[in-house]
Amino acid sequence: MALTNIRVCWGQTVSGFAGFALAILVGLSPHALAQPVGARETAPAPKPEHSVSLRWIGAFKIPTGTLFEGVEFGGISGLDRAPNGRYWAISDNRESPRMYALRIDLDQRGLHAVHIEQMVTLRGADGQPLPARTADTEAIRLTADGHLLIASEGHWSVNPGWRHPPFVSSFTTSGSFVRAFGLPPAFGLIDNRTTGARSNKVLESLAVTPGGSVFAAVEGALIDDGPVSTPASGSWLRLIKFDPASGAPAAQYAYALPPIPLPRPSEAGGAMASLASNGLSDLLAVSEDSFIAVERAYVPGQGVTVRLVLTRIGALTTDVSPLPSLSGGTFTPMSRQLLLELAVSAHGQRIDNIEAIAWGPVLANGNRSLVLVSDNNFSRRQTTQFLAWEVVSP
């Protein structure tokens, strides 16, 4: 089996964080590797190098056109695993907002099968199914009360009747609406041109920490925070921390999204590169302040690049809630450390439109596993792709 090695050097600030987060990731005591918070934030003296690895387990595909209870399966944009081993997946189909219960047969030997067990229609506060074109559901996470937190990134249209705002709301596992979380005004679709959020670039990811804290992040930069990423320049994204009891926003943090990676850099000036896109497609909690971010880039004619990034809200990370713009502002962003990059193809798989990440089961040897899933866009040229890795300690 192939090994993707991650090298962690204590002589660099962000790498010191990576060692701390990876210690949690593989189930070690974080104190075994971590330095005091102040030391991590202020360039500690070089220390011995540590490493962990991701061991490739396998892949499984569900073809586009697969039907379940007479409805086409696809558009999977979020995934989370329940304590009983069942997975909940959210579809971004705007005509019929729905989620699925899945069973994923995964062990150290391979990713053997994915079984669709249940389809659940999402319902509004009135108890009726969410109407068509009122939600673009992109992320899903289980909360301690057994409910499912779902994020919709909203949609802007010049036709007011076709507009729908982004939201973060809680639902039961039977699809009933429980409550809505509050969003800062700047995250609304105001005019899609001069201020507010960008259509199809708003809430794409959710994370719930082991202690129950809730986070959501935008896929692309808010208009007031500057342009979106290009092959030549990166951008600033905002991550919201919510008070889980009230559902109100409690803080915001800045995440640095780098320039769009080009699988073939020699074509940087080509027409296809000018149509490239990059965004934060999901977020998985590792601890109370550490996350794995999924960055997904697409360049027409070249393919998809996916990066897994370890990121952390440190003691010196700025709460940017008071800042009307991140463009030219003074603040300390979240730390970031590249964990894994999948460019176009890997392990015999052509990398598809990866939009979801979840913890898999703890394997027989005690190691944790990770699962990534792609959104097939209901396209015959794509599939719903499940990819799995084992997190291996030194």
Task: Tell where the protein language model's regions lie, with residue ranges.
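Bacterial N-terminal signal peptides
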Residues: 15-29
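Sequence/structural signature of beta-propeller domains
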Residues: 33-394
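N-terminal secretory signal peptides that target proteins for export/translocation
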Residues: 1-11
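Intrinsic disorder/low-complexity signature
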Residues: 2-3, 28, 279
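Intrinsically disordered, low-complexity terminal tails and inter-domain linkers enriched
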Residues: 10-17, 39-42
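Compositionally biased, low-structure terminal segments
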Residues: 9-10, 18-21, 292, 387
